[in-house]
From Swiss-Prot:
K(+) binds at N34, S36, D66. Belongs to the pyruvate kinase family. ATP binds at N34, T35, S36, H37, R73. This is Pyruvate kinase. Its EC number is 2.7.1.40. Mg(2+) binds at E219, D243. Its cofactor is a divalent metal cation. GO terms for biological process: glycolytic process. The lineage of its organism: Bacteria, Thermotogati, Thermotogota, Thermotogae, Thermotogales.
Length: 466
């Protein structure tokens, strides 16, 4: 049984009913809807297909809507591409024009005010480096430090400046409306720079009468400066290594990844690692050795889930990529005992109980850890310790059942709601037996809250299945 969860992007290659069904059968836990592409109707159809199939198959499969955010891009060119040469002058303008080798438009009107002489501007995922030498009301004049080819609508990064961009765009608001309409499990927020961005997203969601978890994508230098504050107000974190590797020196990405995961785990927030997980499999049927090693190291770092993007959205081998990721994850998990997280807030009762639950389950060689839960928080806290046993999260809440599909080691089980906790546990144990997860004579460690309120994990019990 694989503990690490797999998140896959649904795109042109995989948005058919048949392909989504095959992906669920291969063990995909969360489907990502990328709102950088496609319209409302197109994305709604994906959601409806996933919901229909997960109900049909009785699988805890979640849906994550990834909000595109305020991505800064260059405009269209007169030709397919232009080549910039080192030392030449190149201008960025806020006017809408067709660009050439001397000038190109950008979609951020405040850019000339936001940057200053000496700032670095990166184009095309950092492949082209510009240095600001002069600004006017509508233009930013630069000198090319590292040249290369640019095509239409390339990404623009300015790691040294605090840009005046809205954290949520009008397009994002439309897709928040779509997600709340269909009660998706998660929203991912792009280009988070400060905790206020996350709080603003949550407020937008509440305008539609819903409370849906927000996963903050850490992909800017500004986010790293306020990382702990962002983690505290987020419901999960995504290490978005693509833009992050442009905003900071690329050699720092591995260390920063470890730091983000470690801090997220301290605060018991699920973590997704994304970008170029199996990049070579977009074209090739087999991964590189480096990709396989990267997957294992992300799991050793403590990642709850790994995200495939173009590999499943447009790649030639989407199903093979899922199979490879699953196989590598299972193999890496055999050695997780050497990479255990033990840091926690010792002043927090729920955290201390969860830590003790891990220790007790190891000492007794228990078959399972069972966490009756309303919100899912107990299961998330226990999972961060890389426990050897599966964590069965018994919940009467359908939304929690689906959301826990993102959390490593957790097996969500939808259990019948009961007025008495003991009755709920007894029925849950019976269901666990029926699923083949435990049998008579097995020891299970159970941790829950009394009197069953959200966020009050304060009890541990050891039960024998009979």
């Amino acid at each position: 049984m694989r503990s690490t969860k797999i998140v896959c992007t649904v795109g042109p290659r995989t948005d058919s009913y048949e392909m989504i069904e095959k992906m669920i059968d291969l063990g995909v836990n969360v489907f990502r809807i990328n709102t950088s592409h496609g319209d409302w109707n197109e994305q709604e159809q994906k959601i409806l297909k996933i919901k229909d199939l997960r109900e049909k198959k009785k699988k805890p499969v979640a849906i994550l809507i990834d909000l595109a955010g305020p991505k800064i891009r260059t405009g269209y060119l007169e030709k397919e591409f232009v080549e910039l040469k080192e030392g030449q002058i190149f201008t960025l303008t806020t006017k809408e024009i067709l660009g050439n080798e001397h000038i190109v438009s950008v979609n951020l009107s405040s850019l000339p005010k936001d940057v200053k002489k000496g700032d670095t501007i990166l184009l095309s995922d950092g492949e082209i480096v510009l240095e600001v030498i002069e600004t006017t009301d509508t233009e930013v004049k630069t000198v090319v430090k590292v040249g290369g080819k640019i095509t239409h609508r390339r990404g623009v990064n300015v790691p040294t400046a605090d840009l005046s961009v809205e954290s949520i765009t009008d397009r994002d608001r439309e897709f928040i409306k779509l997600g709340t309409l269909h009660d998706v499990e998660f929203f991912a927020l792009s280009f988070v720079r400060k905790p206020e961005d996350v709080l603003k997203a949550k407020e937008e969601i509440r305008k539609h009468g819903k409370e849906i978890p927000v996963i903050s994508k850490i992909e800017t230098k500004k986010a790293l400066e306020r990382l702990e504050e962002i983690i505290k107000v987020s419901d999960g974190i995504m290490v978005a290594r693509g833009d992050l590797g442009v905003e900071i020196p690329i050699e720092e990405v591995p260390i920063v990844q470890k730091e983000i995961i470690k801090l997220s785990k301290y605060y018991s927030k699920p973590v997704i690692v994304a970008t170029q997980i199996l990049e070579s499999m977009i074209e090739n049927p087999f991964p590189t050795r480096a990709e396989v090693t990267d997957i294992a190291n992300a799991i050793f770092d403590g990642a709850d889930a790994l995200l495939l993007t173009a590999e499943t959205a447009v790649g030639k081998h989407p199903l093979e990529a899922i199979k490879v990721l699953s196989k590598v994850a299972k193999e890496a998990e055999k050695k997780l005992e050497f990479f255990r997280t033990i840091e926690y807030d010792t002043s927090d009762i729920s955290e201390a109980i969860s830590h003790a639950c891990w220790q007790l389950s190891e000492s007794l060689n228990a078959k399972l850890i069972i966490t009756p839960t309303i919100s899912g928080s107990t299961a998330v806290r226990v999972s961060k310790y890389n426990v050897s046993q599966p964590i069965v999260a018994l919940t009467p809440e359908e939304k929690t059942y689906y959301r826990l599909s993102l959390v490593r080691k957790v097996i969500p089980v939808l259990a019948e709601k009961c007025s008495q906790e003991l009755e709920f546990i007894e029925k849950g144990l019976k269901k666990v037996e029926e699923m083949g997860l435990a049998e008579k004579g097995d020891l299970v460690v159970l941790t829950s809250g009394v009197p069953g309120k959200v966020g009050t994990t304060n009890t541990i019990r050891v039960l024998k299945v009979d």
